[in-house]
UniProtKB/Swiss-Prot annotation:
NCBIfam families: L6_bact (TIGR03654). The keyword Ribonucleoprotein applies. One of its GO terms (cellular component) is cytosolic large ribosomal subunit. This is Large ribosomal subunit protein uL6. GO terms for molecular function: rRNA binding; structural constituent of ribosome. Pfam families: Ribosomal_L6. PROSITE patterns: RIBOSOMAL_L6_1 (PS00525).
Length: 177
């Protein structure tokens, strides 16, 4: 039995959920999100509670049970509080700045890297060495943060690059003479 899947998802005040077939739509103060569950699970909405139940006892049904419940819980959290990823830039001359909706990164390349935020995700640069990615969709926020980080991943010798806030970078010792 799924320990995660058997917990119902409670809808806080100001959040509504509507179900049509296998598709659930959650609306809240920060927007609306939809999720289509597989045929292995059954979704029910009653009394401000969303319940996810497996159809059958197959391994796939149990896997989808916990995953579907987590997706619905993330949607509820996204439309109420939102999600946020913070990135730090380390390195001499490495910096970030916003120009309208575009993030401009100086990362030691011969050119500046321009990154435009997709719809539903906002990017801010409160300092030249900090980037904040926010949005209602957890997957989109994580994907945008990972794409920004991929432009200059932290290297193990000096630790230069873009890292998540609080991320530990394994450091290596240089060559010995």
């Amino acid at each position: 039995m799924s320990r995660i899947g058997k917990k119902p998802v409670e809808l806080p005040s100001g959040v509504s959920a509507s179900l049509s077939g296998q598709t659930i739509e959650v609306k809240g103060p920060k927007g609306a999100q939809t999720f289509t569950a597989t045929d292995d699970v059954t979704l029910t909405v009653e009394d401000n509670v969303v319940k996810v139940e497996p159809r059958g006892k197959s391994k796939r049904a149990r896997q989808q049970w916990g995953m579907s419940r987590t997706m619905v819980a993330n949607m509820v959290q996204g439309v109420t509080q939102g999600f946020k990823k913070e990135l730090e830039i380390q390195g001499v001359g490495y910096r970030a700045q916003m120009q309208g909706n575009t993030l401009k990164l100086n990362l030691g390349y011969s050119h500046d890297v321009d990154f435009t935020a997709p719809e539903g995700v906002t990017i801010t640069a409160p300092k030249q060495t900090e980037i904040v990615v926010e949005g209602a969709d957890a997957q989109a926020v994580g994907e945008v943060a990972a794409k920004i980080r991929d432009w200059r991943r932290p290297e193990p010798y000096k630790g230069k690059g873009i890292r998540y806030k609080g991320e530990f970078i394994f450091r290596k010792e240089g060559k010995k003479k």
